[in-house]
Amino acid sequence: RSLIAAALLTPLVLRSPCRRVTAPVIGGAVCYAAFNYCFIISTKLTTSANAIMLQYTAPIYVALLSWVFLRERIRRSDLLCMAFVFGGMVLFFLDETGGGTPIGNLIAVFNGVTFAGISIFLRLQKDGNPVMSMYLGNLLSALIGLPIILSAGLPDGASLFFLLLAGGLSALTYALYARASTGLTALETVLLPIIDPVMNTVWVFLTLGERPGALSLLGAAVVLSAVTARVLSAIQP
């Protein structure tokens, strides 16, 4: 998937007038690769709910680091949004938390740190080409996973189709994410994607008919409302 994503991101990198490989570019790439593998490993060693919940502790680290490295002040609306988002996430995963191993939970916490690192390093490139970090990060992820790919053998037709689909979606989403980071604060770049696990419940319900519980619905409503209110407050003149 990462190799396909890197191939699709290549034209964006080549067409950009800014192709310098700076320290923030390398930092973003390393954090992105670490983020990919930490998430995969954490879902194997702890519950999926724990892995996702601990991953989205990233706003805490961003709130601390963005002032130090970016001099971006945390506004009251940011703090309110964070409080409601965390409350909603707790409700969302309340029935699913528990279990897993301490090392799995620890890796999931570190995954939140790497997610925060991506946000900080992309924001440091606001006057450059943050897509370069995503490009190099995908290349690094592919390089790390190359021994596993070679030992697994060639994929069948169905697996190849899903690999192409996943690679294409990954390239599209992270290209957009990198571009959006140039016009958002570091905290906003980690708060807005929290909609992702919430919407997963909606897609699973629509496609597979798996009905979410009352707490999940309440948590989803809280998260969506908090993020929407934060976005609307940011665009008001």
Indicate residue ranges for each PLM-predicted region:
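Specific transmembrane alpha-helical segments of multi-pass solute transporters/efflux pumps
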Residues: 14-50, 55, 91, 164-184
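Hydrophobic/small/kink-forming positions within alpha-helical transmembrane segments
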Residues: 3, 29, 33-37, 59-64, ...
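Specific alpha-helical transmembrane segments that line the substrate/conduction pathway
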Residues: 2-4, 40-71, 111, 186-205
